[in-house]
Design a protein with these regions (language model features):
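Generic structural signal for short, solvent-exposed loop/turn connectors between secondary structure elements
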Residues: 39-41, 55-69, 80-88, 229-247, ...
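Solvent-exposed soluble domains appended to multi-pass membrane proteins
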Residues: 237-240, 251-254, 259-586
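Membrane-interface transmembrane-helix boundary segments in multi-pass integral membrane proteins
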Residues: 127-144, 208-218, 436-443
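Membrane-interface segments at or immediately adjacent to transmembrane helices
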Residues: 182-253, 262-265
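Transmembrane and membrane-interface helices of multi-pass
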Residues: 2-201
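Short hydrophobic/aromatic-rich motifs at helix boundaries and adjacent loops
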Residues: 46-49, 94-99, 124-125, 247, ...
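A diffuse structural propensity rather than consistent per-protein peaks
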Residues: 108-116, 203, 368, 487, ...
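Membrane-interface micro-motifs in multi-pass membrane enzymes
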Residues: 64, 201-209, 292-293, 324, ...
Length: 586
């Protein structure tokens, strides 16, 4: 055993020397004492459960390298502080066990793994501490007991640990392991947008979250914003005055839908193209901020009028992060104008914390898959439309209020490696079309049929009611990856695209039944955070101060939000939202 497991200046007793050959004073290699062997053995034994956990639960090779490098670097810092291997092992393994358990418990309660920002958010005020105490008292007591047990174990280990590590050796280990962790972080690439929700990579997710937490602390708030901004504070009107009863609004979140006409080489039935055309006879391009999945990223911007890109590394779970921190949202604006808001959601309401987010932005009534008695979580669009039509009928029998109905579809969701509803005879792709794309086109044809039927039923069942219908594609289907130049072997999370890529361009359409919407903005592409102001204008509803500023920015930035030139205009807008209390940015 080498010099790093003993005091650097510890003398060598004569009984340890078995040779008559003189040993230089700086070369002091010898077998460690029994106490040191026991201390090292105990340290390794404590690390065995952690090693097994990492092997089975922390992902692929590059992720393993990352989590091991960070863990060992943390241990090296503790060795630098205490000079004792067993103490470092006790603290590292105990704290990892606590973090993994806390992350699991949080995921059970909120459908999201532990993030470094949680430590700052929940411990920053007595109000959040009281929330935890009232709602999760048993968990808090268990955490306190675990921390106390860890402290006692560390004190005992410090008392009996016979190892002594040279601090220069510990510092060298820190440098090497930090370098290894940096390389591993690059190798494992960008974090997948589903990682915090259901990948169960509790430790590596927690480690990764520190970088964006430090970024947020450096920035001073969760969202990018100017240090100061001219202009008055945004006020929220207490009422909404309209000269006539506004139209009912149906907003359809079209899952994984993009116009196939964006790809000139694609052969398909061009009768589908009419699906994407608005009342003005034009197709309008929508720029979203996610590819192939993570619908909640698009939905966040549609409901709040803010870009997820402005949250930096926090963007992938911004729904959970910002629940209760945003005001004057699209649903709240509609509520002020007398609307009743309802949602038809195809999954369970607590999926990726949707229920908390919906409630926080003003969507109080949610019909999830259980409420709708859905046989599966990817029913044909006509199933959700039928439920919505029935609810509209019930509402009109009881109330004269306008109704905002938000419908999320699922039939066009991946995977596309099986034939969805094979009994339905609709065209797919032409000869030579990739099989996944051909299946996607079949489902798109069904989506158009179901949408046309929805319009027909609205006109037939409610001939005296006016309806504004807005539908939009939330992101590309993974089936477009080959058309964008990527391999069929790549999953959605592995497709890396620049912000101006066609892979982020979908569509939005504005339509009406017994109602003619006003003209749409004359711009080439609309960024998704501007869609809520387009909806309010299409319904001819008065705008609050913040939405009037969005309308001005839409024109000034030519429909671009995060990439607006000048960028300072958006950052100043964010500062005014913060100063006005419409965004809690901490």
């Amino acid at each position: 055993m080498a010099d790093w497991v003993r005091e650097a200046d510890e003398p060598i007793s004569s009984d340890k020397v078995t040779s008559t050959i003189p040993i230089p004073a700086r070369v002091r290699w010898y077998w460690p004492s029994r106490d040191r062997v026991l201390s090292l053995g105990a340290a390794l034994l404590l690390s065995l459960p952690t090693a097994v956990y990492f092997w089975f639960y922390e992902g692929h090779a590059s992720n393993q390298l990352f989590v091991w490098s960070v863990t060992l670097a943390f241990g090296a810092w503790l060795v630098l502080a205490f000079r004792r291997v067993l103490v470092a092992s006790v603290l590292v393994n105990s704290l990892l066990g606590i973090v993994a358990t806390m992350s699991w418990a949080k995921q059970q309660a909120m459908d999201m793994a532990l993030h470094a920002y949680d430590l700052m958010f929940y411990l920053r005020s007595w109000g959040t501490i009281a929330f935890l105490w009232n709602g999760f008292r048993i968990h808090i007591l268990a955490l306190a007991a675990a921390l106390l047990a860890t402290a006692i174990a560390a004190v005992l280990a410090y008392r009996y640990d016979a190892t002594r590590v040279n601090r220069r050796s510990a510092l060298f280990a820190i440098l090497m392991l930090t370098l290894a962790a940096s390389v591993a972080a690059e190798l494992k690439a960008e974090r997948r947008h589903t990682q915090y929700y259901w990948d169960d990579l509790h430790i590596s997710s927690f480690y990764s979250s520190w970088a964006e937490t430090f970024e947020m602390l450096w920035r001073g708030q969760l969202i990018e914003a100017a240090a100061s901004a001219p202009g008055p504070l945004f006020a929220i009107p207490s009422a909404c005055e309209t000269s006539t009863k506004p139209p009912h609004i149906i907003l359809i979140h079209e899952e994984s839908i993009v116009p196939p006409g964006y790809f000139p080489t694609l052969q398909y039935d061009h009768g589908i193209d009419r699906f994407f055309v608005s009342h003005d006879g034009k197709m309008h391009r929508l720029q979203v901020e996610t590819y192939g999945g993570a619908s909640w990223i698009t939905e966040f911007s549609v409901m709040t009028g803010v870009s997820t890109q402005s949250f930096g590394g926090m963007r992938q779970f911004v729904q959970s992060l910002m629940a209760g921190k945003l005001h004057d949202t699209l649903p709240e604006a509609l509520t002020r104008c007398g609307y009743r808001n309802v949602v038809f959601y195809p999954l369970e309401r607590n999926f990726v914390s949707y229920d908390r987010f919906y409630a926080s932005v003003g969507l109080k009534e949610v019909f999830d898959e259980k409420d709708q008695a859905a046989p599966t979580d990817n029913e044909r669009d006509s199933f959700y439309f039928g439920n919505a039509l029935d609810e509209i009928a019930r509402h009109l029998r009881k109330s004269n209020k306008p109704l905002f109905t938000y419908i999320l579809t699922m039939a066009t969701h991946s995977p596309y490696d099986f034939t969805y509803m094979p009994e339905v005879d609709v065209p797919g792709g032409g000869p030579g079309t990739d099989p996944e794309m051909s299946e996607y086109l079949r489902r798109l044809a069904m989506a158009k049929i179901d949408y046309d039927e929805l319009r027909h039923e609205l006109a037939r069942r409610f001939p005296t009611e006016r309806f504004l219908i807005v539908h939009y594609g939330d992101h590309h289907p993974i089936a477009t990856r080959t058309l964008l130049g990527f391999s069929t072997q790549l999953e959605a999370e592995d497709v890396s695209l620049p912000l101006d890529s066609l892979g982020f361009t979908t569509y939005y359409a504005v339509d009406g039944v017994n109602y003619r919407p006003p003209p749409q903005p004359e711009i080439e592409t609309l960024d998704v955070p501007f869609l809520p102001v387009v909806i309010l204008n299409a319904a001819r509803l008065p705008l609050s101060d913040a939405f009037r500023e969005r309308e001005r920015l839409l024109a000034a930035c030519k429909g671009r939000y995060f990439t607006c030139a000048p960028r300072d205009a958006i950052l100043a807008f964010h500062r005014r939202l913060i100063n006005s209390g419409l965004i809690d940015a901490h």
